[in-house]
Structure formats: C-alpha cells, structure tokens
C-alpha cells in the first residue's frame, strides 16, 4: 500500500515529495488476471464483490540537503509563466511535453508499451514478466528526475524495462534482480538494446 511505503521512507529520513497516478484499463486487467471482481458478469450475480480497477502510482521522495547536480531545463521564462499548474524544472523538454508530464494524471500511457513488445525476437519459453512497467512511464520519470549521463539504480530489475530505457536515454543502468529467469531475460534485453545502439559495453 502507498501509505506503508510513505511511512517507511519517512522513517528513514525522507519526506514525501509527490505522487503521480497512471490509469490502467480494468478491462485488460480482468482479461489478464481473470479477476471476477472486475468482470461485468459479476454485476448480474452479486455486485457487492465488484470493485474499480487499480491505478499505478509513482511515489517520489526527497532527502535533506542540496542537490549537488541540478537537473537543468531549456524552458524560457515566458513559457514557464504559461504553465498553470506547479511544475518542476526539467531538462531538454518541449513545453507541450512538460505540460503533459506535469498533469496529475497520465492518460496517454499505452499499456502494451512494455519491454515485452520491445523485444525483436523471443522464444516460446522466454520468461514473461506479469506486470512490466510501461516504457513511457519510465521515460517521463527519467526526463523529470535525472540528467543524461546519470547512473540509474533499479533495485527490482525485473526483465530490464528501466535498464533498457536508461540506455536509450543516455543513462547508465545498475539493476538488481534475484529471480534467475528474470535476470537472464534482463541480460538478453540489455544485449538487444546494445545491439540496436551498436554499443559493445554499458559505458
């Protein structure tokens, strides 16, 4: 639960900075999970079990002290004044992109835009991550909260969504993944991305 995560970070000295909600399709969730709580047929039997779909959330936290490497921006003052809602300074983003990213609700996320669709070739037995993060979500987060050349840590590396996006956006990925099958797929996805970029090493 988000509340538990917030309290955990606060206990370690962080303060809650912001949250971003990302709409997820309840229909796609019902198809994927076979959850009767999301199915229309359940309203005909006993709608007391029915519930809305669950959104994704990005929680951001800050710690005390000065940010030694500011995240720079290319937004002039006139354009800045046109933005109605509070917004963080960001780097190398056009004004319309900034307005979209700073909306409280990201409605333009394609649920199929995941690392699974990125892979050019996969075998029948390749590991399938059950809940891969949409690449646009990761891209938006990197635009707001990191510079090119920064090192990005993924403590739950999964199949490499964040690591692949790091490479695509000129960041340096460090990933941690305990499940061996996910780790092998993570390496494969990084290798595929490096081939696309004609790189021979991460750095």
Stretches found by the model and what they are:
Residues 1-185:
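Core catalytic lobe of class I
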Residues 187-203:
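S-adenosyl-L-methionine
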């Amino acid at each position: 639960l988000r509340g538990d995560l917030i309290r955990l970070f606060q206990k370690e000295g962080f303060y809650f900075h912001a949250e971003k909600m990302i709409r997820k399709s309840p229909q796609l969730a019902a198809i994927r999970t076979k959850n009767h709580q999301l199915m229309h047929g359940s309203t005909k039997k006993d709608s007391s079990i029915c519930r809305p779909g669950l959104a994704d959330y990005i929680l951001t936290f800050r710690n005390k002290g000065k940010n030694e490497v500011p995240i720079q921006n290319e937004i002039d003052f006139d354009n800045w004044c046109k933005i109605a809602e509070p917004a963080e300074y960001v780097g190398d983003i056009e004004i319309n992109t900034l307005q979209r990213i700073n909306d409280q609700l990201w409605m333009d996320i394609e649920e199929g835009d995941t690392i699974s669709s990125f892979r050019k070739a996969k075998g029948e037995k390749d590991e399938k991550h059950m809940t891969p993060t949409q690449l646009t979500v990761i891209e938006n987060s990197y635009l707001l909260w990191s510079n090119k050349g920064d090192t990005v840590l993924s403590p739950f590396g999964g199949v490499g969504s964040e690591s692949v996006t790091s490479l695509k956006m000129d960041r340096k990925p460090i990933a941690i993944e305990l499940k061996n099958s996910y780790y092998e797929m993570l390496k494969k996805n990084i290798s595929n991305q490096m081939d696309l970029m004609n790189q021979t090493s991460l750095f």
